[in-house]
């Protein structure tokens, strides 16, 4: 993987009129208009007989397929999915967003939901696609929570992941969940981000009570939660076999398995990401030779806006697609 060090990837130049990690996070996600994408929806049955929604974009036959794993409470409508697939379409490449359970307006049938270390979900999805499209070059990209889940799968699979995908990318992934959770539960972050996340997460937790005669969660307690730590301790951890929030955050974090990644992987994190303290980001000593670190000083959390007002979200998809294109000719 020596040639990874010589990648000629675009340099990120932030919009000078949008300073700061919060503005660079919120504006692209909530205020910037993008032309909507047209998806084709499929419903898949999971190995444990649950259901998820899967959205496809068009592309030319025989071209690569990009599998996108979205972030916390995200979907195929998230700004990062729209910007990536617009540019992929120009290349003729196809895209797919397999929604995590309870996302994409598909209520799931089981108490199980999704979590930041859900590598088992990533595994069956990617292997199903590989089986159904054995001659199609597969690439995987994960954003935020989906990025951590993808990285965890890559680390756990090691070299065998090369039999499934050509290359991967993770954007603004919370590889240290404790550092991320603690950052989101403090100060202005708690009001800007955590409160929004908990608004939909509480509703989904209430729905879970209807799926089990012996629920894992106490709705009266869940109604009172004000932090991600409390929610993960009361809901996420017990629903998915973890012994509380500390166990969940520790075991689900991908940072500890980054040295085991064998698939060419691009790791993009802004140093001013409000979700991830810069000191918690991995260094070259923390990753394998297959991992290419890209850590711009600015960009926010899954933001990376550039250009004059109103700005554009071109740098991130251009960088990811160039990385994927670079690894397309590699012989298996």
Summary of predicted features, one role per range:
Residues 3, 131-239:
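Alpha/beta-hydrolase-fold enzymes
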Residues 20-61, 305-311:
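N-terminal cap/lid segment of alpha/beta-hydrolase-fold proteins
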Residues 63-71:
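Short beta-strand element of the alpha/beta-hydrolase
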Residues 74-86, 278-280:
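The serine-hydrolase catalytic nucleophile loop
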Residues 77, 85-109:
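Conserved alpha/beta-hydrolase
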Residues 101-139:
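Catalytic nucleophile-loop/oxyanion-hole region of alpha/beta-hydrolase
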Residues 261, 267-269, 273:
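Short beta-strand/loop motif that positions the catalytic acidic residue
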Residues 297-332:
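Catalytic active-site module of serine/aspartate enzymes centered on a nucleophile-bearing elbow/loop
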């Amino acid at each position: 993987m020596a040639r990874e060090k010589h990648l000629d990837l675009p340099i990120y130049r932030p919009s000078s009129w949008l300073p700061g990690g919060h503005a660079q996070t919120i504006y692209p996600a909530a205020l910037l208009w993008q032309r909507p994408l047209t998806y084709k929806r499929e419903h898949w049955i999971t190995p444990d007989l649950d259901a998820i929604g899967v959205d496809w974009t068009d592309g030319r036959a025989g071209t690569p397929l990009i599998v996108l794993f979205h972030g916390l409470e995200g979907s195929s409508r998230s700004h990062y999915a729209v910007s990536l697939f617009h540019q992929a379409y120009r290349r003729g490449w196809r895209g797919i967003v397999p929604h995590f359970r309870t996302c994409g307006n598909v209520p799931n049938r089981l108490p199980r939901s999704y979590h930041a270390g859900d590598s088992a979900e990533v595994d069956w999805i990617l292997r199903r696609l590989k089986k159904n499209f054995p001659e199609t070059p597969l690439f995987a990209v994960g954003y935020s929570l989906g990025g951590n889940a993808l990285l965890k799968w890559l680390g756990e699979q090691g070299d065998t992941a090369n039999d499934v995908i050509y290359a991967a990318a993770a954007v603004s992934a919370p590889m240290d969940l404790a550092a991320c959770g603690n950052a989101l539960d403090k100060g202005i972050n708690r009001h800007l981000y955590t409160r929004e996340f908990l608004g939909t997460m509480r509703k989904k937790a209430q729905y879970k009570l209807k799926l089990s005669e012996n629920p894992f969660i106490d709705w009266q307690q869940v109604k009172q939660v004000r932090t991600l730590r409390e929610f993960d301790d009361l809901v996420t951890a017990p629903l998915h076999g973890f012994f509380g929030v500390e166990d969940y955050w520790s075991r689900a974090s991908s940072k500890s398995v980054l040295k085991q990644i064998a698939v060419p992987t691009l790791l993009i994190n802004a140093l001013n990401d409000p979700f991830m303290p810069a000191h918690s980001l991995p260094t070259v000593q923390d990753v394998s030779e297959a991992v290419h670190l890209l850590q711009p000083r600015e960009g926010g959390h899954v933001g990376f806006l550039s250009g004059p007002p109103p700005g554009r979200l071109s740098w991130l998809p251009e960088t990811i697609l160039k990385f994927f294109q670079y690894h397309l000719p590699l012989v298996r």
